[in-house]
């Protein structure tokens, strides 16, 4: 502090935004650390770091052709856990539980390649910006050309087609058709 007193920030940041930024940094660091060590036949699908109740959970979602077994998750945990201990400086502000698991039926689709592979599948798409006043679409992915997702969805009782620019997509995951 100088003789003029404390500096007051003019722009306030919500604590939730700070936590989200910190979590993104942790996810990036963990992803860079574990990706080279998850070798074929396994595929790293996603890394998530969230607070559940009073606990922090680091989830590493891994898959392989035909699905992963409990033994696979155990083997991968034995590879990943020591790797996380080598990260310096330690990015984790609190103790956490490591969870290595399958992405399940509603697996996230994080890359353009995973979206191309999902053409013909039933998906859920969340948007940063609404299209026709809608921010979440659920339907069949008809096409993805790297720039636009084309989805056939049900609006009440009528099928509609929507073209969604990839840059407004916040999150995409597989969905279960009921």
Swiss-Prot record:
> What Gene Ontology terms describe where this protein resides (cellular component)?
cytosol
GO biological process: any one?
A: ribosomal small subunit assembly
Taxonomically, the superkingdom here is Bacteria
What keywords sit in the KW lines?
Answer: Cytoplasm, Ribosome biogenesis
Q: Does the keyword Nucleus apply?
A: no
Q: Does the keyword Cytoplasm apply?
A: yes
Q: Which InterPro entries match?
A: Ribosome_maturation_RimP, RimP_C, RimP_C_sf, RimP_N, RimP_N_sf
A Pfam family reported for this protein in Swiss-Prot or TrEMBL: RimP_N
Give the UniProt subcellular location, in the record's own words: Cytoplasm
State the disulfide connectivity.
none
| Function (record text) | Required for maturation of 30S ribosomal subunits.
Q: Which family does it belong to?
A: Belongs to the RimP family.
HAMAP family (UniProt xref): RimP (MF_01077)
PANTHER family from the entry? RIBOSOME MATURATION FACTOR RIMP (PTHR33867:SF1)
For this entry, the protein name equals Ribosome maturation factor RimP
Q: Species name for this entry?
A: Streptococcus pyogenes serotype M5 (strain Manfredo)
State the gene name recorded for this protein.
rimP
